[in-house]
């Protein structure tokens, strides 16, 4: 049985989120949480929250045993880009792009 958790619109670049997701793909849930706990990246904190949500969904909705769960799939997709303006010299302006992403986590036996 597979259970999902989706986090959308996270203020994180896809290029910074995917390497952290690769660290925990296919691992047991307790091992994945341990890896994310000691990974010093902003993405690790966000992905850990998504993984904890997927675990809670599996336990509450499906009655799954937490000790047997594994991270089946985890992927980070590109979201909308927030475009901002920064004033520059001589009346000019530059665009600042603030990327977002969507995180999809699936856990199962």
UniProtKB/Swiss-Prot annotation:
Origin: domain of life: Bacteria
InterPro entries per the UniProt record, alphabetical: Ribosomal_uL22, Ribosomal_uL22_bac/chlpt-type, Ribosomal_uL22_bac/org-type, Ribosomal_uL22_CS, Ribosomal_uL22_sf
Keywords: Ribonucleoprotein, Ribosomal protein, RNA-binding, rRNA-binding
GO cellular component terms attached to this protein's record: cytosolic large ribosomal subunit
Coiled-coil stretches: none
Disulfide bonds: none
Keyword RNA-binding: yes
Subunit structure: Part of the 50S ribosomal subunit.
Record's function text: This protein binds specifically to 23S rRNA; its binding is stimulated by other ribosomal proteins, e.g. L4, L17, and L20. It is important during the early stages of 50S assembly. It makes multiple contacts with different domains of the 23S rRNA in the assembled 50S subunit and ribosome.
Family: Belongs to the universal ribosomal protein uL22 family.
PANTHER family: CHLOROPLAST 50S RIBOSOMAL PROTEIN L22-RELATED (PTHR13501), LARGE RIBOSOMAL SUBUNIT PROTEIN UL22M (PTHR13501:SF8)
HAMAP family from the UniProt entry: Ribosomal_uL22_B
Protein name: Large ribosomal subunit protein uL22
Lineage of origin: Bacteria, Pseudomonadati, Pseudomonadota, Betaproteobacteria, Burkholderiales
């Amino acid at each position: 049985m597979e259970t999902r958790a989706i986090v959308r619109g996270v203020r994180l670049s896809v290029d910074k989120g995917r390497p952290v997701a690769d660290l925990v793909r296919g691992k047991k849930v307790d091992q994945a949480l341990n890896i994310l706990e000691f990974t010093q990246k902003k993405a690790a904190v966000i992905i850990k929250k998504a993984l904890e949500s997927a675990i809670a969904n599996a336990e509450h909705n499906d009655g799954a045993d937490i000790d047997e769960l594994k991270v089946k799939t985890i992927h980070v997709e590109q979201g909308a880009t927030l475009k901002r303006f920064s004033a520059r010299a001589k009346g000019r302006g530059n665009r600042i792009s603030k990327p977002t992403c969507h995180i999809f986590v699936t856990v199962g036996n």
